[in-house]
UniProtKB/Swiss-Prot annotation:
Domain Radical SAM core, residue spans: 173-407
Broad class of where this protein is predominantly found: cytoplasm
Binding residue positions for [4Fe-4S] cluster 2: C187, C191, C194
Species this protein is from: Stenotrophomonas maltophilia (strain R551-3)
Cofactor section: [4Fe-4S] cluster
Catalytic activity: N(6)-dimethylallyladenosine(37) in tRNA + (sulfur carrier)-SH + AH2 + 2 S-adenosyl-L-methionine = 2-methylsulfanyl-N(6)-dimethylallyladenosine(37) in tRNA + (sulfur carrier)-H + 5'-deoxyadenosine + L-methionine + A + S-adenosyl-L-homocysteine + 2 H(+)
Annotated ranges, domain MTTase N-terminal: 33-150
Database matches in Gene3D superfamilies: Methylthiotransferase, N-terminal domain, tm_1862 like domain
Biological classification of the source: Bacteria, Pseudomonadati, Pseudomonadota, Gammaproteobacteria, Lysobacterales
Gene: miaB
This protein's name: tRNA-2-methylthio-N(6)-dimethylallyladenosine synthase
Length: 472
């Protein structure tokens, strides 16, 4: 590889667990090569990876492969939330370097948040990398690949062209009964520990009608569950009409009217903007799943203030109380950070108290990871690694125990599941998801795949439920 990387000029400045099926990749009309994509991180990255596949299938005739050894183009879609995830990327790139050493003319590209954060530094650290592109420029992949091949030097484009990428993506293609739909990009909250505003930009909402059209297209292809995505999805303000804006509540109500849409989810939310309008949608829209992922991060007001979260523990509990007034049995999951700089034993106990008060379902919890460039990176860390791990273990044990209790209480109840396909454990059975994100395995005919089915829960296991189909 020769020369220095070309850096595309910046465009107009612009401008996450719970698993769902992403929109399926587009099949090329004529296969001209193989594409391999490795995805790290959140559901937004899963969505973006599916769109990368769609774009390159439409433009370059690339078909997805499960093996990088067979690929003509290899892409890694990265996450920079934690240092460990970031280092995994460079480790993976080192493995792929050997493919080039064998004389293959394979294109290797790095996308996602690490790409946005590191830019040309990736080329300096791994000079065999051909492409570096950000979350907002994945639609430019065909041009980047073409430029790399013609100019014989690496290409870098980590600009923030607002919602241009959505205007240039192919029509969505569904694969399965559930699909992601991104409704906004970026985050403007600037929490002191988080890199997202720096890697994905500030908040930019897609136009209301564009989102509704995409959902309608997916529903027409058999999608029954829509997962609305955004870094701060409940800050959605989609322009529509004559200078008006639609919030997430109105978007949900509109999508629920689309023929075929039987279940709606959204993630990830910020408590600061969990509005009464959204609570009213939970009250009025039966298609809105009886489940909410609402990251709280900590239960100590002092720590929440240091994190720049913008709310208190009491305000968080007040929002949950309002929600449970209209959805008494809703499952609430969350995110927690332990060992944030300056977190005392008393602070941690307040987090444990909040967990008891709310009764969280399955949640995500991590030891604080210092991210360069964030305000929290300059805070003094006086907590030992042993103490951080002890706190994390205790927190996870308590949340897991409560989640297990929720599963046990579901035994004997009738639950509606969206049937996803054959069970991985037993191909003679089917598997599906309940509203509260539990995997359920049950004997049933394959014709039920892609449909909603009522089942009776017969057994609660550690990571799943067993059931039988309710007699028709």
């Amino acid at each position: 590889m020769t020369g220095t990387p070309d850096v595309f000029p910046p465009a107009t400045p612009g401008g996450t667990p719970l698993v769902a099926l992403p929109a399926g990749p587009r099949k090329p009309d004529q296969v001209k090569g193989k594409l391999y994509i490795k995805t790290h991180g959140c559901q937004m990255n899963e969505y973006d990876s599916a769109k990368m596949a769609d774009v390159l299938a439409a433009s370059d005739g690339l078909e997805l492969t499960d093996s990088p050894d067979d690929a003509d183009v290899i892409l890694v879609n990265t996450c920079s939330i934690r240092e460990k995830a970031q280092e995994k990327v460079f480790s993976q790139l080192g493995v792929w370097k050997s493919l080039k050493n064998k004389g293959r003319e394979v294109i290797i590209g790095v996308g996602g948040c690490v790409a946005s954060q590191e830019g040309e530094a990736i080329i300096k650290r791994a000079p065999f990398v051909d492409l570096v592109f950000g979350p907002q420029t994945l639609h430019r992949l065909p041009e980047l690949i073409r430029a790399r091949r013609e100019q014989k030097r690496p290409q870098v484009d980590i600009s923030f062209p607002e919602i241009e990428k959505f205007d240039r993506l192919p029509e969505p293609r569904a694969d399965g009964a559930s699909a992601f739909v991104s409704i906004m990009e970026g985050c403007s909250k600037y929490c002191s520990f988080c890199v997202v505003p720096y890697t994905r930009g500030t908040e930019v909402s897609r136009p209301f009608e564009d989102v509704v059209v995409e959902v309608a297209q997916l529903a027409a292809q058999g999608v029954r569950e829509i997962n609305l995505l955004g870094q701060n999805v409940n800050a959605y303000r989609g322009p529509y009409g004559d200078g008006e804006f639609a919030d997430l509540g109105l978007l949900i109500r509109t999508i629920a009217e689309i023929d075929g849409v039987g279940r709606i989810r959204f993630t990830t939310s910020h408590p600061l903007e969990f509005s009464d309008s959204l609570i009213d949608a939970f009250r009025d829209v039966p298609q809105l799943a009886n489940f909410l992922h609402l990251p709280v991060q900590a239960g100590s007001d002092r720590v929440l203030s240091a994190m720049k979260r913008g709310y208190t523990a009491l305000e968080f509990k007040s929002k949950i109380r309002k929600l449970r007034a209209v959805r008494p049995d809703i499952s609430i999951s969350s995110d927690f950070i332990v060992g944030f700089p300056g977190e005392t034993d008393a602070d941690f106990e307040k987090t444990m108290k909040l967990i008891e008060d709310i009764g969280f379902d399955h949640s995500f919890s991590f030891i604080y990871s210092r991210r360069p460039g964030t305000p929290a990176a300059d805070l003094e860390d006086t907590i030992s690694d042993a103490e951080k791990h002890a706190r994390l273990s205790r927190l996870q044990e308590r949340i897991n125990a409560h989640a297990a209790g929720i599963s046990e209480k579901m035994v004997g109840t009738v639950q509606t599941v969206l049937v996803e396909g054959p069970s991985r454990k037993n191909p003679n059975e089917l598997t599906g998801k309940t509203e509260n994100m539990r995997s359920v395995n049950f004997p049933a005919p394959a014709r039920l795949i892609g449909q909603f089915v009522d089942v009776v829960i017969t057994e609660a296991l550690t990571n799943s439920l067993r059931a039988r189909v309710v007699a028709e």
